[in-house]
Amino acid sequence: MSSVATIKRNIIPPHLEVKGGRPLSGILKVSGAKNSSLALMAAALLTKEKLLIQNVPELTDIEVMSEILRNLGAKLTKTNNSIEINSESIHNVELPYELVHSLRASFFCVGPLLTRLGEAKIPLPGGCNIGARPVDEHINGLKALGAEVEVINDVVKAKVSTKDKRLLGANITLKYPSVGATETILMASCLASGKTTISNPAREPEIQDLAKMLNSMGAKVFGAGTKRITILGVESLSGTSHCVIPDRIEAGTFLIAAAITRSPLIIGPVIPNHLSAVISKLKECGCSISQHGNHHLKIIPIEISGVDITTSPFPGFPTDLQAPFMSLMATAKGSSKIKERVFENRMQHVLELNKMGACIYLENNTAYIKGVKELVGSNVEGGDLRSSAAIILACLSAKGNSIFTGLEHLDRGYEKLEEKLTNAGSIISRKFDQITSHSSFSNKIISEDNIDTQKNAA
């Protein structure tokens, strides 16, 4: 009997390979705001006329929202970074779970569906696993506007039972300035009968961008970006053309990329007052930041020292940049403290950063960081969108090579990230499933013998 040698093959899942320790240079281009684009796309359901949204980033979240709108009966035409939406023939009031479970912004459709069709059935939404983000404030706001809302088997069922099928204006006070709840109430009240006020609303730039587009459609929204928003309901809204604001979170990520690689960079386009808290902390930790032309910022890192931050709603330090800033603090001189006050499960990057040589101690939602001279390349994994960005920044600054898995998270919020970073001088490339026998990849390698087992467990 002849013996047959068995070769065990290993597979690396789709990943980024990063050669760290290289300075960046030039310009990092900022795309349109993802979070703004998603709300604007949902708002297109409010009118029977065509609506053109420009400067929309190419992201998987945008693709999911596009599919949701098509499922409702809307017609979409995409050209480069523009999307034309025609919602004249929407007819479906129920969203499928397979689309909604991965995108929290899908819940934005509830208000427009109520105003257009008088009914909506939407499964409780998903998104990044960063802690509880209940839709209670959304539901309470819709109820205040006269909608009948109930949650049955994790499906939100809402309808308008008034004789004319219109919601009714109301005075609403949010317990917490939730961005999503503010946007839901804002869209639902535009076509309501009478006057609506939202006290303690979210003041984020994305709220202001939504209000600006709604007003260009014929809505009457006043006070977006302040502590009280007033909406005077109108009979109908028209189509319009609107350009999405620059993504302040991507811009902040790029500013931190410059700081962590100790590289002078130009970042833009940006709206500086959307980044005031971030710019302030970067200056405090040792960066020079100045206006460069009308729409760009120039950042020059000098000597990075530890500073403390606490996340809070706008205009405070954004929770979406907590993780990237922690990567920077991991390489800063001295100690720092980062407190997360918006979400209770947003420290998934700490373990991966420590794997790269960072010295971070986590106590509840506060991270205590002792800066190290340098991070070391490693095999690392992102657990959500912003932790993935933080880990990529760490890989850029680290000594040696890194393999990053978790592209499904990164692709949700950063358009063509590796292409932009490559243009700025980094060595970073996207790789797909590969066969390898290198032991250095061991903690990210999946044995073919165990693939089915792991799929079943997931």
From Swiss-Prot:
Active site: 128 (proton donor)
Subcellular location: Cytoplasm
GO molecular function, one term: UDP-N-acetylglucosamine 1-carboxyvinyltransferase activity
Post-translational modification 2-(S-cysteinyl)pyruvic acid O-phosphothioketal, affected residues: 128
Domain of life of the native organism: Bacteria
Protein biosynthesis recorded as keyword: no
Protein's pathway: Cell wall biogenesis; peptidoglycan biosynthesis
Catalytic activity reported: phosphoenolpyruvate + UDP-N-acetyl-alpha-D-glucosamine = UDP-N-acetyl-3-O-(1-carboxyvinyl)-alpha-D-glucosamine + phosphate
Main location: cytoplasm
GO cellular component terms listed in the entry, alphabetical order: cytoplasm
Pfam families xrefs: EPSP_synthase
Sites where the protein binds phosphoenolpyruvate: 34-35
Annotated binding of UDP-N-acetyl-alpha-D-glucosamine, by residue: 104, 320, 342
Keywords noted in UniProt: Cell cycle, Cell division, Cell shape, Cell wall biogenesis/degradation, Cytoplasm, Peptidoglycan synthesis, Pyruvate, Transferase
EC identifiers of the protein: 2.5.1.7
GO BP term, pick one: peptidoglycan biosynthetic process
Functional description taken from the UniProt entry: Cell wall formation. Adds enolpyruvyl to UDP-N-acetylglucosamine.
Family to which the UniProt record says this protein belongs: Belongs to the EPSP synthase family. MurA subfamily.
Name of the protein described by the UniProt record: UDP-N-acetylglucosamine 1-carboxyvinyltransferase
Native organism: Prochlorococcus marinus (strain NATL1A)
